[in-house]
């Protein structure tokens, strides 16, 4: 897995995913975004929170697309994390690093998967959604 990240895909564009997107863009990283709610993805694109939108999940696992992505970040609700990871099984053990932002991991059991790094960036706010995106949300915070 390369340490040079140039293109990322964020799945889930609420406060956490959008904050990661904004922070990444400030570092010159190209950000692709997907959300189950097409309106959210469209707003994120219009507000320049993401550089490119992914309209359908099927495109994510398309080899022509995913092989150009360095890092996939899941910023979905905890109960959806495992389901999304399973949908990404075609890229398990590839050169693409997959991580998440979920606070709950006890239901996630993956054996012999070398490119999934579970994480919890202990961050949040009393606000939610795309409108609460903050590129400085993760500064000086602990990540476990």
Where do the protein language model's features map onto the residues?
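Rossmann-like NAD(P)-binding element
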Residues: 62-89
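Receiver (REC) domain switch-region micro-motif
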Residues: 8, 72, 98
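Structural alpha-helical scaffold elements that stabilize or flank donor/cofactor-binding regions
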Residues: 65, 136-137
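Rossmann-like NAD(P)(H) cofactor-binding subdomain of soluble oxidoreductases
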Residues: 82-131
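Phosphate-coordination loops involved in phosphoryl transfer and adenosine-cofactor binding
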Residues: 4-7, 95, 140
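NAD(P)+-binding Rossmann beta1-loop-alpha1 motif at the extreme N-terminus of oxidoreductases
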Residues: 1-57, 61-64
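Conserved acidic residues
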Residues: 51, 70, 96
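Conserved small/polar residues in nucleotide/adenosyl-binding loops
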Residues: 142-144
């Amino acid at each position: 897995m390369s340490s040079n990240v140039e293109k990322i895909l964020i799945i889930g564009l609420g406060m956490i995913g959008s904050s990661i997107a904004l922070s990444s863009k400030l570092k010159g990283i190209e950000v692709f975004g997907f959300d189950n709610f097409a309106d959210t993805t469209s707003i994120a694109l219009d507000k320049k929170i993401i550089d490119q939108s992914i309209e359908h999940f099927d495109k994510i696992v398309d080899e022509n697309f995913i092989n150009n992505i360095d890092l996939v970040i899941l910023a979905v609700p905890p109960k959806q994390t495992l389901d999304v990871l399973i949908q990404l099984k075609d890229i398990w053990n590839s050169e693409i690093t997959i991580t998440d932002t979920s606070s709950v991991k006890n239901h996630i059991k993956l054996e012999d998967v070398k490119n999934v790094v579970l994480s919890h960036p202990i961050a949040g706010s009393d606000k939610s959604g795309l409108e609460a995106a903050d590129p400085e949300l993760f500064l000086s915070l602990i990540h476990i």
